[in-house]
């Protein structure tokens, strides 16, 4: 046994544990309504998945990274060898560059690290392909953008003489990056913008004996495989000749709609690269079989309902196919997912076809239509959570408003309020889905005057001691549900009133109830979809304020937001936006008599806004534009509460993808910043090393949180122990290696290295 003094700054650097500015993801359990424990509940949901392999923890085993085009966010999933399951690992988000629209994971320089081929349209500002080269620096993965020393940092090809242009690709498409000719370097297959033929951009690095860290492309074939796609639908016509491009009846169609995906893959074991094609107009994928050679592809057969009618892909819409070894059996499996933002299946939307055959005779069999997503909270699209205690048992529950589930052949959304009850205890929350359609709110989303994007908040508007419900929605008005249960009783609401007092913020209301002017009456602060203009049509703000002009028992609001004390320019704060779209979502917290305003926005940033107290008609100040460096993707929403009784506020987040995240903030409940000090006391860990059973001994007589982390900060266990000086843990199932034992009180922190043998 040895005593370890805690802890020097170099220790934090050594183990790369993110602290301070990056908020820590909270490990909270969630159960389905059938009592199934979700394995990755707080992964944030998935709408438009693109899936690739990447060895995230450098253990020699490829993991999975999902890029969701809806929100432009990466979702890292570590493969655990012992369980053969994937575990959400959000700490790895920090290593990747900002990706937009699409990404393909391929190792072009064969150094064992996957590089990133991605869309340049919304980064470089040109329709092209950018490449991020992965490398290791001090055992840390870093990326650098590949540069051909042209005007833009994108891939170019020569057009004659000294001229060259970028390899063009529409930002809505998805190319294939693959060694199609079998010469040992990666080529590119894509539809050029406006063209109904696939172009082969051949990589000539091997042919020209260039170094392996180089990329060089030429056009090898502007009708790869000799097939063409209809410009009107997903129909594909094959050529009867190996050296002649197919054509439709005269007049020949040579243009097409934007929206196609291409995957070069081995489908039948003949060593020739076949294709899987997805199209904007198709709810399935089409397989094209190569009857030519690798250097002269000729697609001679097609299967329009791949892999067979019985288990064919049927997902709306615009599908992408991704070949990865999901189960690590050495065979390439296929995952299929929709890639059309906003108008595609947004639940149970990743089909997994396992290769049950051999490398020389692939056979793809459907395993599930909800790969990864079945283990997440995924409520469709557009989640907006609110902490509350609906059953008044002293535990913090979660009510989530949603934009809704996609409904085929309809412009409607099946939007809901979804209730998760806290069935844990004061120190260890545990949530269970208890009502997937709380108060039957989906009724309002399915009619001719459809409402969706519900945004709930609570407060005692009528002064009777219980908490009423105000719900924002896509049209910018509000539903009001009066709670008639009485104080400290299970919520019971009257029939919703809509529109509540004719109040409107024009679109996507996101209300918060707070007595902002301190007159004893709850006012309404609301976010909105669009930044606002004043009565002179000058840009002025991102939040609306409706002051309560009624009485304690009878609230009254004037719908005229230009009429003081109302305003559509609250605080004169303009949140950064995209084409005026800001999607603000305010949360006002009273820190010992001083208000702070927190808000999400369209870019997935959390703003902290100060100078609010006693300044309703004045200018607020944004004091933190990217609080916590939270990475949940676009349209982040939030709610704050201390859900584990440790004196520190926790934050639940929603996003455009319909999932949830939970974080520990840096704010104590009194508003002071949680500047955690290093523990001055001594901690004993024994035995160390050990096979998985160890004891933690310390001298504190106060609640202590003990967490077990790996060296990159992933949490394996976290418990709170009250008034203790000894604690024993059993972690026999952990893999051998170095772990960190994190010991934390309300204002003190220690990290101790523990070796599992």
Whereabouts are the PLM-identified features?
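Bacterial Sec-dependent N-terminal signal peptides
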Residues: 1-24, 673, 740, 749-757
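A generic structural signal for short, non-catalytic loop/turn and secondary-structure boundary residues
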Residues: 2, 329, 393, 678-679
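Detector for intrinsically disordered, low-structure N-terminal pre-sequences
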Residues: 2, 6, 128-130, 524, ...
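C-terminal outer-membrane/trafficking sorting elements
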Residues: 6, 677-686, 690-757
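Local alpha-helix boundary/kink/capping signal
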Residues: 11, 517, 693-695
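Beta-propeller-forming repeat regions
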Residues: 20-673
């Amino acid at each position: 046994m040895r005593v370890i003094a805690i802890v020097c700054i170099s220790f934090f650097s050594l183990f790369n544990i993110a602290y301070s500015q990056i908020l820590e993801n909270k490990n909270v359990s969630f159960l389905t309504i059938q009592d199934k424990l979700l394995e990755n509940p707080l992964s944030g949901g998935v709408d438009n998945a693109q899936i690739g392999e990447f060895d995230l923890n450098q253990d020699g085993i490829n993991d999975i990274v999902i890029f969701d085009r809806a929100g432009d966010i990466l979702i890292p999933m570590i493969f655990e060898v012992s369980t053969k399951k994937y575990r959400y690992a959000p700490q790895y988000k920090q290593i990747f560059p900002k990706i937009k629209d699409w990404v393909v994971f391929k190792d072009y320089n064969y150094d064992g690290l996957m590089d990133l081929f991605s869309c340049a349209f919304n980064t470089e500002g040109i329709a092209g392909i950018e490449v991020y080269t992965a490398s290791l620096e001090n055992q840390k993965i870093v990326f650098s953008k590949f540069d051909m020393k042209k005007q833009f940092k994108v891939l170019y090809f020569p057009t004659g003489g000294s001229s060259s242009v970028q390899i063009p690709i529409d930002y809505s498409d998805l190319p294939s990056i693959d060694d199609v000719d079998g010469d040992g370097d990666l080529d590119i297959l894509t539809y050029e913008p406006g063209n109904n033929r696939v172009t082969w951009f051949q990589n000539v690095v091997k042919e020209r004996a260039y170094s392996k860290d180089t990329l060089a492309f030429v056009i090898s074939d502007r009708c790869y495989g000799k097939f063409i796609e209809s410009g009107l639908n997903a129909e594909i016509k094959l050529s009867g000749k190996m050296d002649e491009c197919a054509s439709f009846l005269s007049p020949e169609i040579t243009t097409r709609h934007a929206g196609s995906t291409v995957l070069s893959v081995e489908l039948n074991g003949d060593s020739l690269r076949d294709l899987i094609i997805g199209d904007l107009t198709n709810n399935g994928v089409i397989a094209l079989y190569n009857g030519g050679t690798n250097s002269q592809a000729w697609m001679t057969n097609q299967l329009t309902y791949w892999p067979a009618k019985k288990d064919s892909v049927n997902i709306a819409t615009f599908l992408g196919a991704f070949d990865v070894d999901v189960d690590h059996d050495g065979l390439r499996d296929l995952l299929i997912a929709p890639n059309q933002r906003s108008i595609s299946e947004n639940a149970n939307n990743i089909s997994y076809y396992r290769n049950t055959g051999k490398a020389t005779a692939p056979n793809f069999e459907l395993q599930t239509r909800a790969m990864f997503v079945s283990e997440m909270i995924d409520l469709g699209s557009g989640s907006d959570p609110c902490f509350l205690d609906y059953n008044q048992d002293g535990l913090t529950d979660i009510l989530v408003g949603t934009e809704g589930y996609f409904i085929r052949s309809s412009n409607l959304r099946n939007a809901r309020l979804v209730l998760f009850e806290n069935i844990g205890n004061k120190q260890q929350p545990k949530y269970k889905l208890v009502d997937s359609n709380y108060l039957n709110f989906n009724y309002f989303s399915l009619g001719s005057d459809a409402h969706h994007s519900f945004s709930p908040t609570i407060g005692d508007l009528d002064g009777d001691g219980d908490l009423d419900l105000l719900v924002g929605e896509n049209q910018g008005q509000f539903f009001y549900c009066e709670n008639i249960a009485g104080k400290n009783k299970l919520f019971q609401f009257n029939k919703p009133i809509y529109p509540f007092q004719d109040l409107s913020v024009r679109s996507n209301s996101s209300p918060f109830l707070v007595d902002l002017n301190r007159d004893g009456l709850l006012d309404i602060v609301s976010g909105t979809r669009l930044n606002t203009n004043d009565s002179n049509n000058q840009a002025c703000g991102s939040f609306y304020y409706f002051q309560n002009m009624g009485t304690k028992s009878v609230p009254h609001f004037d719908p005229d937001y230009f009429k003081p004390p109302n305003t559509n320019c609250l605080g004169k704060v303009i949140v950064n936006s995209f084409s005026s779209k800001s999607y603000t979502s305010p949360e006002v917290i009273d820190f010992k008599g001083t208000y702070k305003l927190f808000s999400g926005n369209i870019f997935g940033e959390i703003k902290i806004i100060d100078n609010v107290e006693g300044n309703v008609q004045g200018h607020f100040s944004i004091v933190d534009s990217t609080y916590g460096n939270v990475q949940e993707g676009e349209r982040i929403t939030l709610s704050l509460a201390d859900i584990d009784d440790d004196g520190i506020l926790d934050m639940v987040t929603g996003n455009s993808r319909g999932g949830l995240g939970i974080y520990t903030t840096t704010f104590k409940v009194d508003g002071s910043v949680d500047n955690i000090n290093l523990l001055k006391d001594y901690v004993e860990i024994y035995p160390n090393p050990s096979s998985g059973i160890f004891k933690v001994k310390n001298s504190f007589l106060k609640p202590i949180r003990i967490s077990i982390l790996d060296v990159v900060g992933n949490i394996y266990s976290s418990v709170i122990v009250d008034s203790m000086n000894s604690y024993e843990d059993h972690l026999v199932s952990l893999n051998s290696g170095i772990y960190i034992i994190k010991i934390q009180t309300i204002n003190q922190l220690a990290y101790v290295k523990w070796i599992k043998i």
